[in-house]
């Protein structure tokens, strides 16, 4: 029997998943079996896979879209029950180097204290740039930090990186770890997002090492940088992130965590209100209160709405102008993207010196944190392209601080009670 069961989860990415399977089959070492789980795709993925690869792979067809974690778990249950020593998880839009599986396998064979080993993942369209090489859970700021994100591959990162978790786009897991108390397979009730982070962190809490290996290389598409049609991502990211920190934050940091998480949720909703992105704001609100209520799994359909994210305020500010200037304030990259945006929407607008320009964009870290409001022809702008243009905007910014602490004050008791109620509920599959 081969020691590695490869599980690929696919949803409507026919062309990508065919490339993913092909990359695995081209691996130098052939000690694996491939299982592709199709999450009820409508693009003919399952038929294309069967036609292209026949009995070289096993295609499992779910009757409905079970999400990323549910799709992976369909395959993980099979490879677990068949007795494979290692599980290799791959996203449908990932592709592995010919040595990747071999490098991961031999490392884990030699390092029995390692429960999860991931590839160093590069951007498919910019293969010299790292997408991620593991993640660290930052309990002080209640977020996850991606190691090596978007940095050029210059050899400066260690060959073996110790981390808290690894994204399941290209990761190998020791089968014995899922038998440990509190680990199990992927947390299916996430549906999608933060499921892989929780799984890896569970493995680490069980006493295993979690690493990424530079010699195990993979490419990952990870979607185009375009506006999404609906608020799907907003809902699952916010609900599952909130749930994660409610469950896993060390007891001594619980109160600080509640302030950080609720502060981040408030910032996202207040910013959406300011930008008149009412559907985005409503979805984040649903996500937050669902996290407090312990709502898991697939969201009710009414909570996923048309994405109304926009740059209307900035575009309206630019219209009818003839010239602009930018005060960068050490935010050169943000200024670069602003120039590109202006060129795309108002190509005739010219950049001039501040004294001659009709409007001057002054960069700050975040408009709601800025102590200095704009005056005259100044427009305050931040990296998210939030901009303060008129007296009404200034008034909203002035109300931000009090509104934020009122939101935290009103919700903290309920938040902490909900967190303590759900802690300790991690169960084996």
Predicted regions and their residues:
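A conserved acidic beta->alpha catalytic loop
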Residues: 23, 38-47, 64
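A short, conserved alpha-helix in the catalytic core of glycosyltransferases
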Residues: 164-217
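Non-catalytic, C-terminal membrane-associated alpha-helical segments of glycosyltransferases
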Residues: 253-322, 400-429
């Amino acid at each position: 029997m081969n020691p590695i069961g490869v599980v690929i989860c696919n949803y409507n990415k026919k062309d990508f998943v065919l490339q993913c399977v092909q990359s695995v089959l081209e691996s130098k070492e052939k000690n694996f079996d491939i299982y592709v789980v199709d999450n009820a795709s409508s693009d003919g993925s399952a038929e294309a896979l069967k036609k292209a690869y026949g009995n070289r792979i096993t295609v499992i067809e779910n009757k409905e879209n079970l999400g990323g974690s549910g799709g992976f778990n369909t395959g993980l249950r099979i490879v677990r029950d068949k007795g494979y020593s290692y599980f290799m998880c791959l996203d449908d839009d990932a592709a592995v180097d010919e040595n990747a599986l071999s490098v991961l396998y031999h490392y884990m064979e030699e390092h029995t204290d390692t429960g999860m080993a991931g590839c160093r993942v590069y951007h498919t369209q910019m293969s010299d740039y790292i997408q991620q090489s593991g993640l660290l859970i930052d309990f002080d700021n209640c977020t996850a930090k991606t190691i090596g994100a978007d940095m050029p591959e210059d050899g400066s990162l260690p060959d073996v990186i110790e981390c808290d978790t690894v994204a399941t786009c290209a990761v190998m897991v020791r089968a014995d770890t899922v038998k440990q108390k509190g680990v199990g397979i992927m947390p299916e009730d996430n549906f999608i997002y933060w499921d892989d982070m929780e799984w890896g962190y569970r493995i680490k809490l069980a006493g295993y090492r979690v690493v990424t290996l530079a010699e195990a290389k993979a490419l990952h598409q990870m979607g185009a940088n375009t506006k999404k049609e609906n608020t799907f991502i907003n809902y699952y990211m916010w609900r599952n992130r909130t749930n994660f920190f409610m469950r896993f934050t060390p007891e001594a940091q619980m109160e600080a965590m509640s302030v950080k998480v609720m502060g981040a949720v408030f910032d996202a909703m207040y910013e959406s209100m300011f930008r008149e992105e009412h559907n985005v704001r409503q979805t984040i609100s649903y996500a937050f209160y669902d996290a407090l209520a312990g709502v898991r799994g697939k969201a009710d359909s009414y909570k996923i709405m048309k994405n109304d994210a926009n740059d209307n305020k900035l575009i309206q500010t630019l219209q009818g102008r003839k010239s602009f200037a930018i005060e960068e304030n050490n935010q050169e990259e943000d200024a670069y993207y602003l120039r590109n945006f202006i060129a795309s929407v108002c190509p005739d607008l010219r950049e001039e010196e501040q004294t001659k320009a009709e409007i001057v964009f002054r960069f700050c870290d975040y408009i709601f944190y800025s102590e200095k409001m704009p005056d005259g022809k100044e427009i305050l702008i931040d990296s998210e392209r939030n901009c303060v243009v008129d007296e009404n905007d200034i008034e909203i910014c002035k109300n931000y601080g009090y509104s934020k602490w009122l939101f935290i004050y009103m919700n903290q008791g309920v938040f902490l009670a909900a967190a303590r109620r759900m802690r300790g509920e991690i169960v084996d599959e």
